Amino acid sequence: VRLVRDFPENALRVTAGDIFYASDGFQSTRSAAGITLARNFALQPYRSVRPAGDTQFDIERTSRVEVFVNGQRVQTLRLAPGRYNIRNFPFASGPNDVAIRITDEVGRTETIRFPFIFDATLLGAGEQEFSHAIGVPSESTPTGRDYDTGGYVFSGFHNIGITDALTAGANVQLSDEQRQFGANVRFATRIGTFRTDIAVSHADTASTDFAVRTQYRYTDDLASSAGRTLSASAIYRGRDFATIETTAEPSNPVALDLAVSYGQRLFWDTSGSIGYGRQFGRGDTPDLDTYSLTLIQQITSEISLSFVESHRAGAEGNDDTRFFAGVSYAPFGSPHRFAASLDTGTRSSRINWSYAPSYTLGDVQADATLERTPADYTLSGSARYTHYRFEGTVQHDENLPRDGDLERIALTSLRFGTALAFADGHVAASRPINDSSVLIAPHPRLRDYRINVNPREDEEADARTDWLGPAVLPSLTSYYVHQVVLDAPDLPIGFELGDQIYGVEPTYRSGTVIRAGTGGTVLLDGYLLDAAGKPLGLHVGTFTAVDEPDRPPIKFFTNRAGRFRVLGLSPGRYELWVEVFSDRFYRFELPEDAAGLYNIGRIEFPTE
């Protein structure tokens, strides 16, 4: 159980209760109950916090703006006059040269170039990322959770973007049994990105020790046809180095771990990578060398092959070579996918079929797998159905021993999930809600008519009203802007749905209500005349509901013949006002059975 309070304007989240906290460097996590304060960039999803150079440009007139990264156009926008920053545009990791081509409404073109380095692991200059948590240790038990009120846990880190190419930070973790202090630095160059972490620890069961990790990564720019990637790492852990999870004597059987990997696109839609690793053991742990080779061949847009060879060479001659080969077939435009693989390391083979429609609502997702090992055959399969109001899953797993003397094991499980959504006095049944939700509540006069939410061309929708009441959109990501479209295909003439397009920006695990329909059920048709019986042509006026004083006035206008048609009225008393005669009105009443197109005939307005 936990409470969450967000401060979106500062991208801060405070959590109290059973907490989950972020970690950095050599930090680890330990279950705890307490409070956390963290910078959460997900609270400002449209704000870029990664480096993009000190690059602003001005637009004097409404213009078409094309963004080029390393000569390749990645985005085209139409922007209004103002000052803009390329922090708001997408860029791939690696060394990038960016050009902004601005074309105004009369065809004049200006190109502005911004050569700079960008890497998604860095913070922009002046940006800060942090997480601080304090509490008491806890652990899960068969009866719930057990809290160690005699102990404590503190975990925190803080990273700062010093420049767009340099980020540095520090971190600390403390408990009643262990202390750890660390620091890191990350910097980007045209030959790649580097990161180094260092940490010092002291545990009650061990002496003071340290750990160091250095990483390197290079990724080709977007314009490269080779798509090269290169990564390397070196990690050293001292014999007595301990993390916050360490409650006994530390165990670090590997002193130094080295790894390097290189990959690129080759030929004929083939890509490959090679890797090498070396572990230097400590004490009785032998040294270990590992080699790997991976090839992926995209034969067609539907068929791909993969091959992996790995070799492990131990110091005592315990060599091991493994091969993995796989093929997958995904027919174009089909939700079906077929795959088969062979693994010599586990001496197993498997075949798999899956069915995953692009739109799952109102459809079934299914998969089935048959695996063969030296000991048995394993058959597993599942099917999941998603309805507007619930989800249901059936899962079957069966183990068939190849040795007839062993017991056959079969397990079938059924799961059903639904939810009740509460918002602003409205209640509705929904399929399980993952984050935020929007509840669409129809006006009482529209309850007998179906309202589709975000309708599609195949007459399906993301949600709809029915005999169970309001519709619910259950899976909206917090702090993003979502468009909600309403459609009522069976609504009779005269019944008013009101606004049909809404924009919502929900907060964390919140519920939003959209009220569909104004209550209007009458399309009023008639003629407006003056006291002498002549048409009041080309006049503007309003209808005001006497019985509903909070209801906004309904504006109308007449044609040259004085005729008007007004949507949004309902049974009850009204006052008709004409703008040029602001000191007088005409009162009338629509009967209780008035619905649809209602002809009120000729209205003689008291113009004298």
What are these regions (language model features)?
Residues 1-64, 69-79, 103, 108-137, ...:
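Flexible, glycine-rich linker and terminal segments associated
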Residues 79-91, 96, 471:
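Short acidic/polar hinge/loop motifs at secondary-structure boundaries
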Residues 84, 96-98, 482, 574-576:
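A short tyrosine-centered beta-strand micro-motif
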Residues 88-91, 473-477, 566-568:
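Short, flexible loop/turn segments at beta-strand junctions in immunoglobulin-like
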Residues 93, 478, 560, 570-571:
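Surface-exposed loops/turns
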Residues 132, 136-139, 144, 154-172, ...:
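Core alpha-helical transmembrane segments of integral membrane proteins
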Residues 148-156, 164-166, 178-181, 347-352, ...:
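Outer-membrane beta-barrel translocator/receptor signature
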Residues 551-556, 560-569:
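C-terminal structured "cap/appendage" subdomains that terminate the fold
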